[in-house]
Amino acid sequence: MKNVFLTGIFLVIAQLCFSQSFDKHAHRGGKSLYPENTIPAMKNALKMNITTLEMDLAITKDKKVILSHDAFLSPELVTKPDGTYIPKDSGFYYKIYDMPYAKIQTFDVGLKKLDNYPDQKKMKAQKPLFSDIIDTCEAYSRELKRPLPFYNIETKTRPFSDHIFHPEPKEFVDLMMKIIVKKGIQERVIIQSFDPRTLEIIHKEYPRIMTALLVEKVDDKKLAQQQFHFKNIPAVKFKQYPDHLNGVAGDLKFLSFIPPIYSPDHTLVTLQLVQECHALGMKVIPWTVNTKERLKELKDMGIDGVISDDPRIFE
């Protein structure tokens, strides 16, 4: 009983600290300005007074926890060691889960020009270790004499890609949490996921950690695309995570608890959705909002924070 009480107090304190002001998340460190999920991106976000650093985690063949949105070396972002690019149709060949970290480090993720992000600075960069990101961001915040940041960390798992792109959720969570606990940042961490399995593990085994349910609308077209890429996976595995086809209530049926944060695609947000989430005790932090006009519309609906590629919208 005492442990349950202390855990509750811990969560209340963490949420109070988290809720002092509108929560500004730099998506992948703010990919509009710097190469995504890299140390330079995170440091720039800290300089711009971002509240929370949003990032994605992947697991390598040798069980290193690294930052990567994609489960493979993306043809859109990556330059090979010889200076050439990965062919567009062969991205899945370079699966992170099949590669040791030392090999991944030989590929560059900061030099290739991205047409969708013309303001992104080009520089040599590699996919960093999660532990190095924490060490760097903690030290840089102190150097800037700024409050230590929150970390919004996505577990990049899906029921249909276990043992293909990542280990099973339990192993993924344990590898990640070992680093979080070692670095002592539990009170400033949010674990977000589209995969309810990882959130359930966090809730049951690491109850002090805040969680966020990521939500997107999965229609028949999107479902067909997923099934095309994973032809040998049973169809039922593609329907084991929230699809928003039945609203907030339908999404929450995938969990045994109500998470502190509901994080939908911003196009799904309505005044009614925000009010429904607030009535359930959930904050609403949508993704990915990249214009000041859309930010104002969402703030007028009462959202609690936002995830953006472009930290300049908060200026």
Q: What residue ranges belong to the model's regions?
A:
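Bacterial Sec-dependent N-terminal signal peptides
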Residues: 1-22
